[in-house]
Amino acid sequence: MAMPTLDPNAPDFTRRYPNLADPRLGAEATFATDEFFAPKDRMLNPEPAVFIPGKYDDHGKWMDGWETRRRRNGGYDHCIVRLARPGVVKGVDIDTSHFTGNFPPAASIEAAYLPDGEPTDATQWTEIVPSTTLQGNSHAYVAVASTQAFTHLRVNIFPDGGIARLRVYGQPQVDWKGADRTKLFDLAAMENGAYVVEANNEHFGPASRMLMPGRGVNMGDGWETRRRREPGNDWCVIALANPGRIRKIEVDTAHFKGNFADRVSIQAARVVGGTDSSLKTQAMFWQTLLPEQKLQMDLQHYYEAEIADLGIVTHVRFNMFPDGGVSRLRLWGVIE
């Protein structure tokens, strides 16, 4: 499975937060006013959009995305997307790759919180992305300021046309109130609400991929840094899904063979106050949760006895020495 190409011009929210519209996490396009030329499901495909010259089907040119017919009677088209998890949307990427003479001139996005069902005609929608001008074969990145959690989106295109991909970056919201305080939870799982605060280098793959569910599908499905030609090491800071006491750690180098990290260590702290941007410097001085451990290629490494008891922590700094790649990081712990 191909992974989306890193866009150096993409805003930070595309690297920091998971894509809540990822079908691998459970997202689904549930309704569209029209999908004559291309089905709505393609718009959520986690792989980059492709163009296949000369490929046609019964409806015309095959396009990798959602595409509606030409409207002749006024109005506009829309598609309903159920997010993989209820979450606070931080930003969106409306991608029109390969749509040139058939992209919508504009789009907007509305949202609703419907934990127990699907939208109806009576659903009250909140606009989170105002009508935004689109260009063909390009990405429209739009930051979202709302702090409310949503479960569904309504993507409006004016008046018709095609969108190759929709990415909805945000922080999943999990209700921890009734959770078992004796059960181990993966506090580094993005589906539980963990996210990458900052990483010093993400040349070949964003650190957020380490927090994805399941094992990596190939070498592109993980965090990989450039080759380090100077002293030091690579690192990333992760905000845990919930404050907790770490009991078990997994570092998975699946598919990384000639480029896996030689060694790793983890520092941790209970952070009170401050902002995400202030953690970069603080993290250098956090206590050691897991001392340096030698890694092997293409292997799941598990640690329990090696973990220091630091009590309840909220953030970790994951260090790779000196550079390289790691596919997945799991931090199982009991919550506060």
From Swiss-Prot:
UniProt pathway: Nitrogen metabolism; (S)-allantoin degradation; (S)-ureidoglycolate from allantoate (aminidohydrolase route): step 1/1
Top enzyme class: hydrolase
A GO biological-process term: allantoin catabolic process
Gene that this sequence comes from: alc
Gene Ontology MF annotations: allantoicase activity
Species of origin: Ralstonia pickettii (strain 12J)
UniProt keyword Hydrolase, yes or no: yes
Similarity section: Belongs to the allantoicase family.
InterPro entries: Allantoicase, Allantoicase_dom, Galactose-bd-like_sf
E.C. numbers: 3.5.3.4
Catalysis: reaction(s): allantoate + H2O = (S)-ureidoglycolate + urea
UniProt-recorded name of the protein: Probable allantoicase
Keywords: Hydrolase, Purine metabolism
Tree of life domain: Bacteria
